[in-house]
From Swiss-Prot:
The lineage of its organism: Viruses, Varidnaviria, Bamfordvirae, Nucleocytoviricota, Megaviricetes. This is Minor capsid protein P9. The keyword Disulfide bond applies. Keywords: Capsid protein, Disulfide bond, Late protein, Membrane, Transmembrane, Virion. One of the minor capsid proteins that constitute a network internal to the major capsid proteins and outside the lipid membrane. The minor capsid proteins glue and stabilize the capsomers. Stabilized by 2 intramolecular disulfide bonds. The transmembrane regions anchor the protein in the membrane of the underlying inner membrane. It comes from Paramecium bursaria Chlorella virus 1. The gene is A407L. It comes from the Viruses. Interacts with the major capsid protein.
Length: 210
């Protein structure tokens, strides 16, 4: 399955057009780069301040929003300047790898961690891999299914006494492992190597969509 490679957005004061490219991204997430988080916060402040200014009929709220944006941007600029790397390969820019959405085997009461059990394979030999635990909704569903009918200690707020260490999603959750993907993970893809093309070593931020 092909993947889509997306370069990270510059911060808004370097390219103002990025604010309008993704108007719906207003909540910073861990999958975003630092500049993309700043852009998301700027959009959120803009929307809120101008909405309140229109409702209250008071332009001072818009000015307050612009002041907050200026403070956030200044803090980002000063922080970026302090943490500037002295890496010799300073021309290499990280990029985000956005994985294509695909079907997955969801958690169930009989198989909370979506493992390739004998029963699961008998039901569907061509079952897709288990859904990613990085998905907050899926992680919550797995925990609920695992804890269903389980005698729990009410004082165990960190969930350390219910055998979570022994039960987890296995690396391979299909009938057969994907040896091609594993080989590419170990030795790289069939494309150029770092020696042939330095851009092949560009650091990446992996973003999971499903």
């Amino acid at each position: 399955m092909k993947t889509e490679t997306l370069y990270q957005d510059p911060v808004w004061f370097q390219d103002l057009s990025v604010i309008f490219k993704r108007p719906s991204e207003i909540i910073p997430t861990r999958d975003q780069s630092d500049s993309e988080r700043i852009n998301a916060m700027v959009r959120l402040v803009l929307y809120c301040s101008f909405a309140v200014a229109l409702i209250r009929q008071n332009y001072l709220y818009a000015i307050l929003g612009l002041a907050i944006i200026a403070i956030i941007s200044l803090a980002y600029a000063l922080g970026a300047k302090k943490t500037k790397s002295n890496e010799a390969y300073g021309n290499i820019r990280p990029y985000s790898v956005k994985r294509s959405k695909k079907s997955c085997s969801k958690s169930s009461a009989n198989n909370p961690f979506s493992n390739a059990t004998v029963g699961a394979l008998l039901d569907n030999e061509a079952r897709p891999p288990a859904c990613s635990y990085d998905d907050n909704d899926m992680a919550s569903t797995m925990r609920k299914n695992f804890n269903k009918g389980l005698f729990r200690n009410l004082d165990d707020v960190y969930e350390v006494e219910n055998s979570q260490r022994q039960f987890y999603t296995m690396p391979v959750t299909t009938a057969a492992p994907d040896l091609t993907a594993f080989g590419q993970f170990l030795y790289g893809s069939k494309g150029k190597t770092c020696k042939e093309d330095p851009s092949a070593c560009t650091p990446a931020f992996a973003t999971r969509d499903g």
